[in-house]
Amino acid sequence: MELAGGTDARIVVIPTAASQDHFPEDWSGLAPLIQAGAEDIQILHTRDRRKADTEAFAAPLAEATGVWIPGGRQWRLVDAYLDTRVHQALFELLERDGVVGGTSAGASILASYLVRGDPETNQVMVSPEYQVGFGLLSKTAVDQHLLARGREDDLWEVLDANPDLLGIGLDEGTALVVRQDHAEVIGVSQALFYDATEPPRYARSFASGAIYDLGTRTPVATAADEDASEEDRDGIQLGTRP
């Protein structure tokens, strides 16, 4: 809400990852945004990608200052919106300094590589037919519910086959605020970053307040780091791979 303009924010919610086909104006999924002060919210939803590729359907995004994508199954978002006018409008929103955010499936879809895209189960990391996300975060794969569901090692399967990708794992109650290449961790738990480009491969965990450079794949020193130990500054190394 703050990034989208506070009480002046114009929010478009895209709930298509969920299983239901209809989302009324009083849909309960809007409650967190309303509680955060949102006064101008529109729901944008379709299962028809031809409709999603029309200017008329995507028009609310042209006026939006923020987009929020709730959870569900990410393959539904691919089927409805990948390479459509809606997808293009998300990039245009960022170009005019708007914000696009999401939770669970709505977080994973923002990456260039799509994890857990299999329509049958969310336990499969790599689905042959669903490997492409929206790409707002280039050269990345984003997993979620990481520590809460014991998924700390799951991203290695993706990175073993695609070592150029940066793996990002988000625990519940935790998010990244990304500006250009800098990703700031906020929330109550951890964000993990996985790098398989050079041995030894590693995953590093960072708590709220840490900033990670997605381009150089290194932590960014902050004022709070001056009194921290070297281990705290560099993050906690997890799951090093040979």
Q: What do these predicted ranges mean?
A:
Residues V12, A18-E63, I69, R76:
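Portal/gating segments that form or line small-molecule/metal binding sites
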Residues G37-D40, R96, P163:
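A short helix-to-beta-strand connector/capping loop
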